[in-house]
């Protein structure tokens, strides 16, 4: 099986992992956070922008995403996150399946973390 890493140059890593991995026609992107921004809306957009860059680096687009998992530091931020996420996927013919939930804490004080996986 052909397996390769997908990297995000200049991005801070918080552990020993790849930003993404593609194996055959399937890909997985590690959770993306954007702690350089304040507020859940801006952090959500920042994480989505990183995902777009990773997808582009792998020759993929948002259309290739099959599943998104969204972790929130505070479930009360769900509506604000959902507004930004909804705008991101509004043009997709088939929206990704998704799970969203609160976690006790996220890396580096992030308010939101987004994980995606999909296929070519």
Label each PLM-derived region with a short phrase.
Residues 1-66, 72-120:
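N-terminal presequence-like segments and the immediate start of the first folded domain
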């Amino acid at each position: 099986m052909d397996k390769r890493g997908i990297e995000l140059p200049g991005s801070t890593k918080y552990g020993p992992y790849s930003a993404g991995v593609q194996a055959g026609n399937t890909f997985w992107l590690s959770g993306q956070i954007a702690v350089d921004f304040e507020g859940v809306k801006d952090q959500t957009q920042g994480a989505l922008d990183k995902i777009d860059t990773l997808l582009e680096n792998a020759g993929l687009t948002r259309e290739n995403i099959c599943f998104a998992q969204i972790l929130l530091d505070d479930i009360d931020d769900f509506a604000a996150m959902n507004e930004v996420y909804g705008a991101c996927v509004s043009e997709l013919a088939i929206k990704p399946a998704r799970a969203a939930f609160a976690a006790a804490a996220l890396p580096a004080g992030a308010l939101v973390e987004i994980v995606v996986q999909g296929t070519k």
